[in-house]
Amino acid sequence: NIKTSTGKHAWYYHRLEKLRDTLSASLLKVTDETTAGVLSSMLLGDKSYLDDEIKDLYQVSGISHILAISGLHISIVGMAFYRLLRKRRVSYTAAFICSAALILSYAVMTGNAVSTRRAVGMFILTMLAAALGRCTDMLNSLGIMVIYLLWDNPMVLGYAGFVFSVGAILAIGIVTPLMSEPKGEKFWASVSIQLPMLPVVAMNYYELPLFAVFVNLIVIPALPVVFISGLLASAAGCFGVMPGKLLVFPAFAVLKLYEVLCGLVMKLPGASVITGAPDGYRIFLFYAVMSGFLVAFSLKKRAIECGLKEKGQILYSVQRVVCTAVLLAILLVKPKTAAQLDILDVGQGDGIFYRFESGTCIFIDGGSSDRKQLGENVIMPFLKYNGIQGISYWFVSHADSDHISGLSEVIDSGYTIEHIVVAEAAAKEEAMEELIFKAKEAEIDVCLMSKGNSIEINDASGSRNTANEEADGIMCLYPGAADTASDRNDMCLVLKLTDGAFSGVFGGDISSEVEKELVKEF
């Protein structure tokens, strides 16, 4: 975002800031807030009123890249202005200087993000080559901009926007020529851009949108319509609402199409697969295998060009399919993990995760009284980072907000929870009834547990772990179905977890008096 500036150039930055605010306000006048928020993000780099649900929908569908200022934006604005000047018989040099000045101002106005600076730099190099009567090489231009950006700030190497921006251009320049062909060109071009970026996506979002290739085949060709319509509408809206409403309609219609398309895709099984953050060895293996396939593609293309057409073409097509499948398997297939216990830092509250050696995952509580949006900012990132695709049993000790606030958000997110387990003696409390109602609305099975009840957890083969006398699983130690207490904390679900040689007791907020009684009994 543009910050307050002082000095001899401050007036320039202030004018750009005012222009962005004016165009953003114009969009709010000519269309609804949701559409205006998306257009402001795409055109002006202003995400201040971008709808969170739309942002999340675009992200899990694999099209969140359209919300950033990219090379497409720079090309449309810069090339349109450059061609306009050339039609007016302006010289190559003058057209280049004016176009570069416009693009640099646009970059500053939209926040001058790293990806924008990369795109602007490459555009200026392309225009400079044209002005000098030369052609430009995309990968060399990218190399120059990478050196410049790293020289300016070496820390951008760890910035996701830089990695995504540079990675996408590398994929276009190296992988696309080797994987695409006239038959199915658009599909394989989309695959060749998406495939090399999968580890980067998994490292930053911990999940992969498997249908992004197909979604982008529809989304990207329509982007110029959205961009041009939105830009014209924002300008026209400054002079009159009705012209702006007419001009924004194409953008509005396309964005609604995007929303419907993403909604339909997310209903498909496996639309978004939680992978967790891939470790270094899997990332190395991914790119090593991909490099091997690219060498094979290069040799096969050369053979096809030398006349071995029919047989070579079939083998080439098979190689591309196998390459895609193998690379996906490297990221999606995970080795069996050991038992794992994590006590999350939730502030004033409780949140405990446990994964049995068999792979069954449970969660106990998940709430905080002093951290807002705990589910979105703490619990969900933790689960996705660890590659946890669902929770088999989510135990609720009691219904105080510092134990269930995050769980409530997780339910709203649609994350997979098979069973929610609550104390039978506390099931009639108002707060607990509200939680049970929300769970049932989300089609989550609700189980009532009381003293003596247990849930057995078998290993992957279905057999019981005999390393311990007790069966692996969870046993309820307290309260009984008929127990009562004046203090709600003393009605907490007390659980004993057993997994092979490991066992532990989880008591929620029970008082020391109840603890002493349980020690005597057990």
Could you describe each region identified by the protein language model?
Residues 112-303, 510, 516-518:
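Internal transmembrane alpha-helical bundles of multi-pass membrane proteins
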Residues 418-426:
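Short internal beta-strands
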